């Protein structure tokens, strides 16, 4: 291969990184995260049963889906691995809200992010719209996990 050849690679945002990582079920704690039925969840309750006649101690997880708020449960042997989602929270400045429910956000490097909808939480949507319409300088927190993103919090950083 000669030096004059150039190779162009398409950039992918996640660079092929795994959306989850394994963790032993017995070490997952309340307020941690877990994947149940292929959904990223926050653990609200963990209970363990003792080893029985046939096998392992078991962990019973009760968790809430971090994007749609649904309650999910799972029972896993405590010595087995379960999937834990990579959950990230990023703050963006709100620039605009479009008629069709999408938001324009300003990233830390000065670019705009236009692919996010308003959240499903009605009270949060009302706070965002009210603050935006009254000209406040708003910063939204976007939570992302397993290829999904959603606005989960709002901060007023003062008047524009």
Curated annotation (Swiss-Prot):
<keyword id="KW-0648">Protein biosynthesis</keyword>
<dbReference type="GO" id="GO:0045905">
    <property type="term" value="P:positive regulation of translational termination"/>
</dbReference>
<keyword id="KW-0385">Hypusine</keyword>
<comment type="similarity">
    <text>Belongs to the eIF-5A family.</text>
</comment>
<comment type="function">
    <text>Translation factor that promotes translation elongation and termination, particularly upon ribosome stalling at specific amino acid sequence contexts. Binds between the exit (E) and peptidyl (P) site of the ribosome and promotes rescue of stalled ribosome: specifically required for efficient translation of polyproline-containing peptides as well as other motifs that stall the ribosome. Acts as a ribosome quality control (RQC) cofactor by joining the RQC complex to facilitate peptidyl transfer during CAT tailing step.</text>
</comment>
<keyword id="KW-0396">Initiation factor</keyword>
<dbReference type="GO" id="GO:0003746">
    <property type="term" value="F:translation elongation factor activity"/>
</dbReference>
<dbReference type="Pfam" id="PF21485">
    <property type="entry name" value="IF5A-like_N"/>
</dbReference>
<feature type="modified residue" description="Hypusine">
    <location>
        <position position="53"/>
    </location>
</feature>
<dbReference type="InterPro" id="IPR048670">
    <property type="entry name" value="IF5A-like_N"/>
</dbReference>
<feature type="region of interest" description="Disordered">
    <location>
        <begin position="1"/>
        <end position="22"/>
    </location>
</feature>
<dbReference type="GO" id="GO:0045901">
    <property type="term" value="P:positive regulation of translational elongation"/>
</dbReference>
<dbReference type="GO" id="GO:0043022">
    <property type="term" value="F:ribosome binding"/>
</dbReference>
<dbReference type="InterPro" id="IPR020189">
    <property type="entry name" value="Transl_elong_IF5A_C"/>
</dbReference>
<protein>
    <recommendedName>
        <fullName>Eukaryotic translation initiation factor 5A</fullName>
    </recommendedName>
</protein>
<dbReference type="GO" id="GO:0003723">
    <property type="term" value="F:RNA binding"/>
</dbReference>
<dbReference type="GO" id="GO:0006414">
    <property type="term" value="P:translational elongation"/>
</dbReference>
<feature type="compositionally biased region" description="Basic and acidic residues">
    <location>
        <begin position="1"/>
        <end position="13"/>
    </location>
</feature>
<dbReference type="InterPro" id="IPR001884">
    <property type="entry name" value="IF5A-like"/>
</dbReference>
<dbReference type="InterPro" id="IPR019769">
    <property type="entry name" value="Trans_elong_IF5A_hypusine_site"/>
</dbReference>
<dbReference type="InterPro" id="IPR014722">
    <property type="entry name" value="Rib_uL2_dom2"/>
</dbReference>
<dbReference type="InterPro" id="IPR012340">
    <property type="entry name" value="NA-bd_OB-fold"/>
</dbReference>
<dbReference type="GO" id="GO:0003743">
    <property type="term" value="F:translation initiation factor activity"/>
</dbReference>
<dbReference type="Pfam" id="PF01287">
    <property type="entry name" value="eIF-5a"/>
</dbReference>
<dbReference type="InterPro" id="IPR008991">
    <property type="entry name" value="Translation_prot_SH3-like_sf"/>
</dbReference>
